[in-house]
From Swiss-Prot:
SMART domains for the chain: DHDPS
Any GO molecular function: (R,S)-4-hydroxy-2-oxoglutarate aldolase activity
Binding of pyruvate, residues: 47, 205
Source organism: Rickettsia typhi (strain ATCC VR-144 / Wilmington)
Subunit structure: Homotetramer; dimer of dimers.
Keyword set, alphabetical order: Amino-acid biosynthesis, Cytoplasm, Diaminopimelate biosynthesis, Lyase, Lysine biosynthesis, Schiff base
Protein name as annotated: 4-hydroxy-tetrahydrodipicolinate synthase
Primary location class: cytoplasm
GO biological process: diaminopimelate biosynthetic process; glyoxylate catabolic process; lysine biosynthetic process via diaminopimelate
Gene name of the encoded protein: dapA
PROSITE patterns assigned: DHDPS_1, DHDPS_2
Entry GO terms, CC: cytoplasm
Amino acid sequence: MYNIFKGLITALITPFKNNKLDLYAFESILNQQIKHEVDAVLIAGSTGEANSLSFEEYKLLLKTSVEIVNNRMPIISGCSSNNTAYAIELAIASKKIGVDGFMASPPSYVKPTQHGIYKHFEALHEACNLPIMLYSAPTRSGVDFSDETILRLSKLPRILALKDCGVDLERPMRIRAIVKEDFNILTGNDEVVLAFHAQGVIGWISVTSNIAPKICKELLDKWYNNDIQGALEMHQKLLPLYKALFLESNPIPVKYAAHYLGLCENEIRLPLTEASDSAKKQIKKIITSLSIKI
């Protein structure tokens, strides 16, 4: 099975206007990603405020994505839930709508055992024949995959990748040593993208590429083309932006940054709130200093 989980994947924000999906802004955001040739987009993940979407909004967002992208790049949906039956419902809807794969984290809040995590993903795998990427974000979910659980899950035919949002630089090497060769590991942490690539990672699921897809794509292309020094120089230049986009809980800062650049309204759903004045000031300063434009 072809592995779609690789390269630069943008974890897209979800724009709102008057507390409804702003599909006009969403089309503009998607077209920017297509223009700058990112390798795939992730819809309705953490950055996309998936927890705040109704099931109908979720399906509409995916349907709109499929129509706009029109097979020009893979679309990955977020199917995380602490209710296994609902996660399956999200996955089945994703398949029916026409996305290319989905990502899911271990169930949050309920703190399942490793066996429970395995059974959750086994149920997802049996219910839907889309390719699956595991999502490791323990600061959000409260639990994480053990290396042994990743190994067990990687033996299921359609579980093809792991998104690792941590900073344990040994982990990619440990996982690479035990899983099948075509199982991909991607980083979901912008600040350590090159450090993780040096440890065997072959993809970047980025928040920053919402507002700087061209720069992020160039950075990763330099790395893949063995221009290590060029990639390091770009990465160093972007470090202040990475940090600014995590001054407060994601996606609060990136939603404001997108608004500042004219991509969407600065509207975010509770329990998240708008960026503080201090964060806004820092974000504007860094965007200006880097001459980022859409």
